[in-house]
């Protein structure tokens, strides 16, 4: 297949190229001298298996509790008390009534 393609390309370029293409297509690659060395001894390495983690419920895997959640929850307040901060009252505290001497 390569020779046919090379000849078609060579015909398009000219006959001088055809001889060059035929030579390059048919020349085999030079063979290297074969000296076989003894194969290296293969060592098999054992894999270390990790210990299996304790099984957990599916919900426990997904939801992690934070340390903040374990602290004591603040005292609950009414919704209005959360929104409206109390302001200082300008009234003076009432003085206790003088008790008559008995």
From Swiss-Prot:
Gene this chain is encoded by: asr
HAMAP family, alphabetized: Asr (MF_00546)
Species classification: Bacteria, Pseudomonadati, Pseudomonadota, Gammaproteobacteria, Enterobacterales
Entry keywords, A to Z: Periplasm, Signal
Compositional bias per record (Low complexity), positions renumbered to this chain: 22-41, 91-102
InterPro entries reported in the protein's UniProt record: Acid_shock
Residue ranges, compositional bias (Basic residues): 80-90
A GO CC term attached to the entry: periplasmic space
Name under which the protein is recorded: Acid shock protein
Organism: Escherichia coli O45:K1 (strain S88 / ExPEC)
Function recorded in the entry: Required for growth and/or survival at acidic conditions.
Location of the region described as Disordered in the Swiss-Prot/TrEMBL record: 22-102
Keyword Lyase: no
Post-translational modification: Proteolytic processing gives rise to the active protein.
Span of the signal peptide: 1-21
Main location: periplasm
